[in-house]
C-alpha cells in the first residue's frame, strides 16, 4: 500500500498558513487530515546529478518567475482533468530550519490502476533569509501490475504523470519508450527496490517502484540565491 512507503508531503511543524484556495470551490481542508495524507519521501540532501539548462545558477527572481509559470500550467492540468486541488503557502520547520513552501497538491483515495494517488508540486525556500531554494514535483501512481506482467504493456505518456511532468519541464515532445521499457523490466523481474534516475535537461527524474505503486519525482538543483 502506498501509505507504507510514501511519507507525508506536508510533514513538519507548520508555523503559519499564508494562502489557501481551491480550483473549483472554497471548501476548507482539514489540516490534521492533510498531514496524514499519502505523499512522497523526502531526500532533499541527495546528491544532484543534473546537467543542463535547469542546472543554471538562477537568481531568486528567476526561480520565482519559473515557479509562477509552472504553477499556472499545473493548475491548467488539474482543471483539464477535473481535479480538485489545494494551493497554499506555508512556513514550517524542517530539520530545525525555517522553510517557506508554496505548493499545489491533490490526493485521490483508492485510485484505479494507472491513476494518480497523490500529486505535489512546490517551490521551497530555506532559512529565515530564504537564501536557497528548489522546485519539486512528486507523484504516486497505482500501477496495473497484471497488464504489465501479462501483456508487457505500460506507457507513462498515457498516464497523468506525463501531463504534470511536461507542465514542469515544458517539453511535450519527450519520447517515453526507454523509460517504459525500464519500468516494465523492473515489474516483470520483481525488483522490489527498482529505481530509475534520469537527467532531464538539468532536472533529476527519479522513478521508484514499490509493490503496486510507482513513485515519481522531478527535482531541480538546490539554487543558492546568495551568489
Located regions from the model:
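Positively charged n-region of N-terminal signal peptides that target proteins for export
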Residues: 1-5
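Long, charged/polar, surface-exposed segments that mediate recognition or autoinhibition
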Residues: 119-188
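N-terminal, intrinsically disordered, polar/charged segments of Gram-positive cell-envelope systems
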Residues: 7-8, 12, 22-105
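Short, charged interaction patches at domain edges and termini
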Residues: 198-227
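C-terminal motif of bacterial Sec signal peptides marking the signal peptidase cleavage site
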Residues: 16-20
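Envelope-exposed proteins and targeting segments
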Residues: 133-139, 194, 203, 214
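A cross-family detector of function-defining hotspots
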Residues: 81-126, 173-209
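Structured, amphipathic secondary-structure segments that form assembly/contact surfaces
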Residues: 110-111, 133, 141, 189-190, ...
Amino acid at each position: 500500500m502506498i501509505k507504507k512507503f510514501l511519507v507525508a508531503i506536508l510533514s513538519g511543524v507548520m508555523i503559519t498558513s499564508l494562502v489557501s484556495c481551491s480550483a473549483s470551490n472554497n471548501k476548507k481542508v482539514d489540516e490534521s487530515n492533510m498531514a496524514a495524507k499519502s505523499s512522497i519521501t523526502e531526500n532533499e540532501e541527495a546528491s544532484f546529478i543534473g546537467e543542463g539548462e535547469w542546472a543554471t545558477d538562477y537568481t531568486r527572481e528567476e526561480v520565482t518567475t519559473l515557479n509562477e509559470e509552472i504553477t499556472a500550467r499545473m493548475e491548467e492540468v488539474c482543471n483539464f482533468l477535473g481535479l480538485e486541488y489545494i494551493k497554499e503557502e506555508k512556513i514550517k520547520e524542517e530539520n530545525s530550519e525555517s522553510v517557506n513552501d508554496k505548493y499545489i497538491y491533490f490526493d485521490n483515495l483508492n485510485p484505479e490502476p494507472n491513476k494518480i494517488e497523490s500529486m505535489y508540486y512546490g517551490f521551497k525556500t530555506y532559512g529565515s533569509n530564504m537564501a536557497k531554494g528548489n522546485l519539486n514535483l512528486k507523484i504516486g501512481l497505482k500501477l496495473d501490475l497484471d497488464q504489465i506482467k501479462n501483456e508487457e504493456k505500460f506507457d507513462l505518456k498515457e498516464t497523468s504523470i506525463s501531463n504534470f511532468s511536461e507542465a514542469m519541464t515544458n517539453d511535450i515532445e519527450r519520447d517515453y519508450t526507454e523509460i517504459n521499457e525500464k519500468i516494465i523490466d523492473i515489474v516483470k523481474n520483481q525488483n522490489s527496490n527498482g529505481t530509475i534516475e534520469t537527467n532531464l535537461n538539468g532536472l533529476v527524474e527519479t522513478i521508484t517502484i514499490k509493490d503496486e505503486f510507482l513513485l515519481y519525482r522531478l527535482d531541480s538543483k538546490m539554487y543558492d540565491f546568495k551568489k
